[in-house]
Amino acid sequence: MGHDYKLFAAQAIFAGDWCKVAQMRRFRQNGIFRTATCRPTTGDNVRPIRKSNKLDDVCYEIRGPALEKARQMEDDGHKLIKLNIGNLAVFGFDPPDEIMQDMIRNMHGAAGYTDSKGLFAPRKAVMHYTQQKKIAGVRIDDIYLGNGASELIVMAMQGLLNNGDEVLVPAPDYPLWTAAVSLAGGSPIHYVCDEQADWMPDIADMRSKITPNTRAIVVINPNNPTGALYPREILLEIIELARQHGLIIYADEIYDKVLYDGNVHESIASLADDVLFVTLNGLSKNYRSCGYRAGWMVISGDKRHAKDYIEGLNMLASMRLCANAPGQFAIQTALGGYQSIDDLVRPGGRLLKQRDLAYKLLTDIPGVSCVKPKAALYMFPRLDPAMYPIADDQQFICELLAEEKVLLVQGTGFNWIAPDHFRLVFLPNSDDLTDACGRIARFLDGYRRRHAR
């Protein structure tokens, strides 16, 4: 073997192939000498760099192909009305001034790493908030701060799931949940929310989909994309299913203050102490602070059997070092200050007026129906398939974008079961919202005529 090494090394040196020389030296040092050639770095033989197989089942249509088409149109000089993302600041919904001022005052202390779970003061503020929500037994150590709730959703799934594990996720859902389950190696199993029952979870359907592989139930309440708000009796039925089958309940409550018509949100984690709950929330929606990336995750309920899972969460929190410090500094002031969201959702408030306007304009269109949202920032209207025979709702959305320069998200992007819905954000001012809905109505009128039977 030594003779072979000298021979091939000499040939490589003579040829000036120093890459092969270095490679053979490594092989010899490791006791694995073999002839090998370096893969060329230029030319037609370059191996394509492909994404991980872990991403094969991951999809996030809110920022999907239609958005790419929209960006291209904007680059070409077209002005669009974007009703695809609940990004409040771009529509003139600014964060409270005291939050911004407090972040600025604390910026000198934001240069270093914080504790991996977050600074003490904002976590204590979150603990007090859980007490206001009547979630019992939460300690500082049960609270994790993150770069938005989205980061913590992914972390929670990574810490829980093995290949083949199943998680019950609503249909329609906020698609990050489905994507996070898939990325972690799990299988998202979608339980139906019933449009005829104001988008309430179908408990019988949920029950029928529990198997020995089921690990958890995801509850998005208030719901994105439907705007549904779940009453106590529904929440108690979900808890009972989790209790019977030993499942974790993940509660996404990011819209828990964006409530209309005097509705009140009840946290599912406040209704039992013998089930493990993971509750996620943040500043993005209630405090119009999407870009601050300030969210939190709270572990509550029966934690005795979850020590290993919690250890995994601690490990993952440490691996990402910490959440951004400026966003953490915003939390205490936000939770303890004046709740200006109330001014936006009460009678005369901008969000309430725009919800009512969007609802009327959409439901006045022939063949369009919609459950009026009780919460959140979205409409999820249905298009009568007899009038709008849509086979591919992504193509439908792209056609609307091309013809009327209005950007929406198709219903199947939220894992809905049929191509007969879309989601609309009602954040633009009344004039722009009226313009957008008028364009949608014009497009649908043409679509009906083209597909008339």
Residue ranges and their predicted role:
Residues 332, 348-359, 370-384:
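Conserved glycine-rich beta-strand-loop-beta hairpin in the small C-terminal domain of fold type I
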Residues 189, 194-265:
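Active-site phosphate-binding strand-loop segment of PLP-dependent enzymes
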Residues 76, 184, 244-245, 275, ...:
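Helix C-cap/helix->beta junction micro-motif
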Residues 45-148, 155, 322, 334-337, ...:
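N-terminal small-domain helix-loop-helix segment of the aminotransferase-like
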Residues 208, 389-391, 395, 399-408, ...:
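PLP-dependent enzyme catalytic core of the Aspartate aminotransferase-like
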Residues 159-181:
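Conserved PLP-anchoring active-site segment centered on the Schiff-base-forming lysine
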Residues 26, 270-349, 359-361, 444:
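Conserved core segment of the aminotransferase class I/II
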